[in-house]
Swiss-Prot record:
InterPro entries: Ribosomal_bS20, Ribosomal_bS20_sf. GO terms for biological process: translation. It comes from the Bacteria. This is Small ribosomal subunit protein bS20. GO terms for molecular function: small ribosomal subunit rRNA binding; structural constituent of ribosome. GO terms for cellular component: cytosol; small ribosomal subunit. Keywords: Ribonucleoprotein, Ribosomal protein, RNA-binding, rRNA-binding. Binds directly to 16S ribosomal RNA. Belongs to the bacterial ribosomal protein bS20 family. Residues 1-22 have a biased composition (Basic residues). It comes from Pectobacterium atrosepticum (strain SCRI 1043 / ATCC BAA-672) (Erwinia carotovora subsp. atroseptica).
Length: 87
């Protein structure tokens, strides 16, 4: 553990941010998994609704720097392609 007061504070702040980021990342992954699950059921309307719920969350995490913007774009592109391929 740190001895200097400012280093102790930084350690506390870092741990707080780590927990918050982990929570946000987990939430985002859950929304992505819901889209994959909806695609697996074969219902295009449900999959589209799940995607519409997921998209702003992924974009928000990318704008905050939690994930890279290209990763967000890759997730969205992959899922849209799968949804459009459904009948």
């Amino acid at each position: 553990m740190a001895n200097i007061k400012s280093a102790k504070k930084r350690a506390v702040q870092s741990e707080k941010r780590r927990k918050h980021n982990a929570s946000s990342r987990s939430m985002m992954r859950t929304f992505i998994k819901k889209v994959y699950a909806a695609i697996a059921t074969g219902d295009k309307e449900v999959a589209q609704k799940a995607f519409n719920d997921m998209q702003p969350i992924v974009d928000r995490q990318a704008s905050k720097g939690l994930i890279h913007k290209n990763k967000a774009a890759r997730h969205k592109s992959n899922l849209v392609a799968r949804i459009n391929a459904m009948q």
